[in-house]
């Protein structure tokens, strides 16, 4: 009776033109052409494939019953082949593939209703023509036992069936439907509790195998059922047992029960769906990183990751659309009381929460990620950072805050500035406190105002050249003393780098500064056009442009770096400006040297050169080559000078010569003259650069000959005896040989161009001409062999005509081998020693 009711839905098919073949003596015999239909008997649950002759419809060419365990094969697109229960091989060749499709659908429908043991298999040839691929379209499916009374035998059979059913998509889909539409997981978990209570160890191991196999099905619906409230703890408990470690048992449930009270709500979460999504995300994370870490294959791992990403996207969208972030930021905006320990702890938890949200957002699609970051900045992220860097002393919390900054600027370095512009242009800009950040670095007098920040370290004082006023302004103020968010961020990071005691936090701040100060991150491919950018610089300087809502990125970049050199650089490089580096941490000095090198190479020379030369930065870098510093710092200083030389700028070259900044470099070479080490290679690499560029300048005499001619001539005249000792590389001897050619070229250029800068110390109308005059006069006096001991201070903070001989540099570290000149000898005596040793 059941079969009768099932048969009602099976309808006959439309006639389709076919050829009927019978296999006789291993040859297919054509028995005729006709029209095939799939039909069911009215009174009995029987189905047939019926073919009638196309010329004589009353003549039946074929009537084959669908019964037993017949396997029908669909070969290619138009052929159905099978062997009936009498052993006769039959084939139907359809005129069109649509006819074949209709009969295949009929076979599938019959199989699902009353002839469950028949099957339909698709057979396709491989692309290489070798062999074939079989795929089950429909057929009998063996499913695991769902009997409430499970035992070792039924569990073993269920495991075998589950593994076999992964081989074909049809069997896999049928098994998935069985799992989802029955209480199979509930049956397994119930038996797990019984087996654990009765110590049925084999049953426990089989249950663990079965659950792991379900994960390998890679079906999202099954995965979500495994982690729902009804099944998750049972599933995790089953996975505590592992056949790889049969004598051991994990403690996943104990871990979860211990973690459960630690889920804290900094701000009450009223959305129950949101709460469930967060719980599911955590459960998947725990499975992926703890429970199944040794078991998951790539497909299962990717499935869990994709589901987690979906949940995380939902979480981030819900957070930014509701009032949750506003309520969270209000903790830092309206509560300045630092004596309330509970409030301080809530603020710390809030930073942990925000950092976790930011790290989660790193996995989102770029549009979703950008929207979330903009929402954070608009709603007051800088108020949170203000607490983290100016109030909080816990280094772990400060590191998390730095992580947030780095994640945002690494994604979009202009995002903070662009959001700041949107806020400034909004009707509420006057009352927005987001850009009014206390960096704790500068007060109105240029001194530090953060006595207790950064773990009690002394802060940095800005020099008088800073000219920056206090970043603290009354709410609603639009005075020039206010720092925009991007400059406030630079000041915060500078403060961390200079004063914090955590090495990890310093390194994070350093990397963030590198990202923020690299113009390529701002401009992308547009930055490649240097000539265009330089013209923009000049136009900007002449017209005093101010940033507008429609300001293109190029002018935003100019405005940004101009503010950096006016407000941040004097603070960041204060120790280099003052020259007071004694007693400072060499690792900090090393990072500062790398930042100077970044400014020289990546920033437009019209901005960076003025700041570096006017503040005597290179003089301090020269001090860092002294033996009292670690070798890494000394070599970094040499590389910085090498980078300046490679820039091929006349101002830089003249400054290096006039301030004798090659003296400490050659002192370092003297210390390591006969050592095959990094110090020796680093200095010689500098000479190699000079020699190579000098050779190029011979070919392009009208372009840039002067700079390297002058530099080569200076080095050979001042350090010739030392260069002659470096006879194990070819380019030092080339420098000496080319100095003769260079001297002739310099004389020729001087004859053509006339005498330049005949006076020294005079005030020029333009500051740059004043600076250059000082350098040229110094160089001129050195060329004449004059050595004035009482010189006036140059505009850079150094002596104008300070010509120190190589012998004046003290050496306090490495001695030299026998035959090496002792440190402290004048050049003339050094030359005598060289001739004696030879």
From Swiss-Prot:
Keyword entries, A-Z: Nucleus
Domain of life, source organism: Eukaryota
GO BP annotations, alphabetical order: DNA damage response; meiotic recombination checkpoint signaling; negative regulation of DNA damage checkpoint; negative regulation of glucose mediated signaling pathway; positive regulation of double-strand break repair via nonhomologous end joining; regulation of double-strand break repair
Biased segments, Polar residues type: 747-761
One protein family per Pfam: PP4R3
Cellular localization per UniProt: Nucleus
Start and end residues of each stretch annotated as Disordered: 452-482, 745-838
Ranges of biased composition (kind: Acidic residues): 783-792
Gene Ontology CC: one annotated term: nucleoplasm
Molecular-function GO term, any one: protein phosphatase activator activity
Alphabetical list of InterPro entries matching this protein: EVH1_PP4R3, P4R3-like_central_dom, PH-like_dom_sf, PP4R3-like
Role: Core regulatory subunit of the histone H2A phosphatase complex, which dephosphorylates H2AS128ph (gamma-H2A) that has been displaced from sites of DNA lesions in the double-stranded DNA break repair process. Dephosphorylation is necessary for efficient recovery from the DNA damage checkpoint.
Known partners and oligomeric status: Regulatory subunit 3 (R3) of the histone H2A phosphatase complex (HTP-C) consisting of PPH3, PSY2 and PSY4.
Database matches in PANTHER family: ATP SYNTHASE GAMMA-RELATED, SERINE_THREONINE-PROTEIN PHOSPHATASE 4 REGULATORY SUBUNIT 3
Name of the protein described by the UniProt record: Serine/threonine-protein phosphatase 4 regulatory subunit 3
Organism expressing this protein natively: Eremothecium gossypii (strain ATCC 10895 / CBS 109.51 / FGSC 9923 / NRRL Y-1056)
């Amino acid at each position: 009776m059941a079969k009768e009711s099932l048969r009602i839905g099976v309808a006959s098919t439309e006639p389709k033109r076919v050829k009927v073949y019978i296999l006789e003596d291993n040859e297919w015999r054509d028995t005729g052409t006709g029209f095939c239909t799939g039909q069911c008997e009215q009174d009995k649950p029987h189905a047939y494939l019926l073919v009638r002759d196309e010329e004589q419809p009353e003549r039946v060419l074929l009537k084959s019953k669908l019964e037993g365990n017949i396997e029908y094969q669909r070969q290619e697109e138009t052929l159905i082949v099978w062997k009936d229960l009498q052993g006769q091989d039959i084939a139907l060749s359809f005129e069109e593939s649509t006819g074949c499709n209709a009969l295949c659908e009929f076979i599938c429908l019959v199989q699902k209703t009353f002839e469950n043991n028949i099957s339909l298999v698709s057979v396709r040839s491989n692309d290489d023509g070798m062999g074939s691929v079989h795929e089950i379209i429909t057929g009998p499916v063996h499913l695991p036992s769902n009997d409430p009374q499970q035992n070792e035998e039924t569990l073993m059979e269920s495991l075998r069936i589950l593994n076999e059913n992964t081989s074909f998509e049809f069997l896999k889909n049928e098994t998935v439907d069985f799992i989802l539409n029955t209480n199979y997981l509930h049956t397994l978990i119930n038996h797990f509790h019984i087996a654990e209570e009765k110590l049925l160890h084999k049953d426990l191991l089989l249950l663990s195998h079965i659950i792991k196999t379900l994960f390998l099905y890679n079906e999202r619906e099954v995965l979500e059922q495994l982690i729902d409230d009804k099944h998750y703890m049972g599933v995790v408990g089953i996975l505590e047992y592992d056949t790889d470690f049969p004598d051991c048992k994990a403690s996943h449930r104990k871990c979860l029960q211990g973690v459960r009270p630690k889920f804290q709500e900094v701000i009450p979460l009223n959305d129950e769906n949101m709460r469930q999504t967060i719980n599911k995300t955590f459960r998947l994370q725990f499975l992926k990183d703890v429970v199944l870490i040794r078991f998951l294959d790539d497909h299962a791992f990717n499935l869990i990751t994709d589901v987690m990403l979906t949940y995380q996207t939902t979480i981030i969208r819900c957070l930014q659309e509701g009032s949750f972030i506003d309520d969270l930021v209000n903790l830092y905006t309206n509560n300045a009381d630092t004596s309330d320990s509970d409030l301080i702890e809530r603020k710390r938890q809030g930073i942990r929460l925000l950092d976790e949200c930011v790290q989660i957002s790193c996995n989102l699609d770029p549009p979703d990620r950008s929207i979330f970051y903009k929402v954070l900045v608009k709603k007051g992220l800088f108020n949170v950072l203000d607490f983290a860097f100016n109030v909080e002393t816990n280094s772990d919390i400060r590191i998390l805050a730095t992580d947030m900054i780095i994640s945002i600027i690494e994604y979009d370095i202009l995002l903070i500035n662009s959001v700041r512009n949107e806020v400034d242009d909004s009707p509420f800009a006057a009352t927005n406190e987001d850009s009014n950040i206390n960096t704790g670095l500068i007060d109105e007098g240029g001194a530090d105002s953060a006595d207790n920040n950064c773990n009690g370290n002394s802060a940095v004082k800005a020099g008088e050249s800073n000219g920056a006023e206090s970043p603290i302004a009354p709410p609603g103020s639009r005075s020039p003393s206010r720092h925009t968010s991007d400059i406030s961020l630079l000041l915060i990071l500078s403060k961390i780098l200079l004063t914090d005691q955590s090495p990890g936090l310093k390194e994070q701040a350093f990397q963030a500064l590198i990202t923020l100060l690299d113009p390529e991150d701002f401009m992308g491919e547009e930055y490649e056009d240097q000539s265009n950018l330089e013209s923009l610089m000049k136009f900007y300087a002449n017209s005093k442009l101010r940033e507008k809502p429609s300001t293109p990125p190029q002018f935003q970049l100019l405005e940004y770096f101009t503010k950096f050199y006016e407000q941040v650089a004097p603070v960041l490089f204060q120790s280099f400006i003052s020259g007071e580096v004694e007693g400072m941490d060499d690792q900090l000095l090393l990072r500062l040297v790398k930042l100077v090198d970044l400014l020289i190479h990546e920033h437009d020379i019209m901005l960076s050169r003025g700041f570096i030369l006017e503040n005597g930065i290179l003089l301090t870098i020269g001090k860092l080559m002294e033996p009292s510093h670690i070798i890494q710092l000394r070599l970094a200083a040499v590389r910085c000078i090498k980078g300046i030389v490679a820039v091929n700028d006349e101002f830089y070259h003249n400054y290096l010569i006039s301030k004798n900044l090659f003296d400490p470099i050659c002192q370092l070479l003297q210390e390591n003259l006969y050592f095959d080490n990094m110090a020796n290679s680093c200095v010689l690499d500098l000479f190699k650069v000079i020699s190579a560029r000098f050779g190029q300048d011979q070919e392009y005499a009208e372009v840039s000959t002067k700079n390297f001619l002058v530099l080569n001539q200076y080095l050979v005249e001042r350090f010739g005896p030392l260069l002659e000792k470096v006879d194990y590389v070819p380019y030092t001897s080339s420098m000496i040989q080319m100095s003769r050619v260079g001297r002739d070229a310099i004389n020729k250029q001087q004859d053509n161009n006339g005498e330049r800068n005949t006076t020294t110390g005079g005030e020029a109308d333009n500051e740059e001409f004043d600076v250059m005059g000082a350098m040229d006069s110094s160089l001129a006096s050195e060329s004449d062999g004059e050595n004035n001991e009482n010189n006036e201070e140059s505009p850079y903070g150094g002596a104008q005509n300070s010509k120190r001989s190589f012998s004046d540099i003290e050496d306090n570290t490495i001695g030299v081998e026998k035959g090496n000149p002792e440190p402290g000898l004048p050049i003339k005596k050094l030359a005598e020693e060289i001739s004696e040793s030879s």
